[in-house]
Amino acid sequence: MNTSHKTLKTIAILGQPNVGKSSLFNRLARERIAITSDFAGTTRDINKRKIALNGHEVELLDTGGMAKDALLSKEIKALNLKAAQMSDLILYVVDGKSIPSDEDLKLFREVFKINPNCFLVINKIDNDKEKERAYAFSSFGMPKSFNISVSHNRGISALIDAVLSALDLNQIIEQDLDADILESLETPNNALEEEIIQVGIIGRVNVGKSSLLNALTKKERSLVSSVAGTTIDPIDETILIGDQKICFVDTAGIRHRGKILGIEKYALERTQKALEKSHIALLVLDVSAPFVELDEKISSLADKHSLGIILVLNKWDIRYAPYEEIIATLKRKFRFLEYAPVITTSCLKARHIDEIKHKIIEVYECFSKRIPTSLLNSVINQATQKHPLPSDGGKLVKVYYATQFATKPPQISLIMNRPKALHFSYKRYLINTLRKEFNFLGTPLILNAKDKKSAQQN
């Protein structure tokens, strides 16, 4: 466990399903990060987030519910106990509206034995009359417990104060204040802007996204099972390759729209939001069986969010057909992603995992690329001379100049006399020419045509 205040303190929220762990997590994080609902066992993976409690930065873990009869309960329990062992403080949450069960008491004692730095948090004590119900939890043997109501925001401030006191954080900010101020004054603002590559892992249910996340991070952060749809919340993990940080987001598996039920609807919305923040998508395809229509639909998410993309062919050790046949099918079905690099892997055997990491950095460099204006115009001029622009009803169509106005992804404006006359086929020709000249591997290239007036306004 962490002992130095220079190391980020870790708080784990544990307890049985549907007692309010994710709601407490969201309340402390002041953001709806974990999905909450009336379904027991909504959280299946460990959500992790750096948050600030009264100005003190800590790391908060929200774990899956440890129900005895729950599917995957052994795997979830093992992950939770591991989180408990690694944490500086545990918030064990119980439902104050329910009678304490023998199973709950047994689980609490097991957690307490692993890590005695533990608070008993009795949730759903919505008013003073309901405080009497909390006495039923005296059998847990804790000298002090915390009666709270996350939904009514009762008792949260007192809990936060106790957490900071238990972690010895109240004194730290006073001791380090002067040094922190001096350090911030000496540090240029641009040095504080740390560039982290955000990578979203997308794919159908049970294609191996969580296994890929675990292989990339070398941690069992994401629960892996043959049960389809094990991951519900998008969860993230950051690794370091050289001096480059990469944050992976393992998103919920996507089903056919007609099969999306209950909590998975929320999970799909969270996946969309996670991709909005991503730079690159790892599209995981299961090659133990032929590709399906849903694979193609999911691949369009990368295009929708203008992400860099890498195609990851998982379960290669049990592929359904020879290499040549699979690649030929891939090129036919995913023709619009012909610029995307393809990597074969077996996550369970850690095949080509390092190659994926380095390819992410390579694609990100292309995704962030800026072409010098003179060089860009030279290539565009050569392309238009080699294949002149088609006329517009007999009238000359002309490109005055080109300029790149954005990166991530690269966006280029063609300033023209008749921008509406630029045919999509000629636009595709120019994009392919730029790809060939400047190597935009795995990167969408956005080309817009504008007239001089609109270009000057922008």
Swiss-Prot record:
Q: Where is the EngA-type G domain?
A: 9-171, 197-368
What Pfam families would the database entry show? KH_dom-like, MMR_HSR1
Annotated KH-like domain residues: 369-453
Coiled-coil stretches: none
Q: What are the UniProt keywords, alphabetically? A: GTP-binding, Nucleotide-binding, Repeat, Ribosome biogenesis
Classification via Gene3D superfamilies:
3.30.300.20, P-loop containing nucleotide triphosphate hydrolases
Write out the GO MF terms.
Answer: GTP binding; ribosome binding
Q: Which residues bind GTP 1?
A: 15-22, 62-66, 123-126
**What InterPro entries does UniProt report for this protein, alphabetically?**
G_ENGA (IPR031166), GTP-bd (IPR006073), GTPase_Der (IPR016484), KH_dom-like (IPR032859), KH_dom-like_a/b (IPR015946), P-loop_NTPase (IPR027417), Small_GTP-bd (IPR005225)
Q: Which GO terms describe its biological process?
A: ribosome biogenesis
Top-level taxon of origin: Bacteria
Does the keyword section mention Ribosomal protein? Answer: no
What NCBIfam families does the record point to?
GTPase_EngA, small_GTP
* Function per UniProt: GTPase that plays an essential role in the late steps of ribosome biogenesis.
The UniProt entry's sequence similarity note says:
Belongs to the TRAFAC class TrmE-Era-EngA-EngB-Septin-like GTPase superfamily. EngA (Der) GTPase family.
Q: By what name is this protein known?
A: GTPase Der
UniProt organism field: Helicobacter pylori (strain ATCC 700392 / 26695) (Campylobacter pylori)
Q: Which gene encodes it?
A: der
